[in-house]
Amino acid sequence: MRDQLEKLVHEMLERGIRYEDAKREFERVFIAKALARCRGNLCKAADVLGLHRNTMTRKVTEYRIKRKGAA
């Protein structure tokens, strides 16, 4: 995983992607994937990521992530 990450970071730097943009996109994708893996269950996804439920809710709203499979 470390080698893949280093290659990705190198590519991003070459393309001029800024740190804040990279961090934001990583967080958005990471949260969306965890939420999908937990079938839209916000509490389970928050637990998987080690986030508080309120933080997870705020970030899902902030990034406008759709909760597929949510009841």
Give the residues covered by each predicted segment.
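Bacterial C-terminal helix-turn-helix
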Residues: 2-71
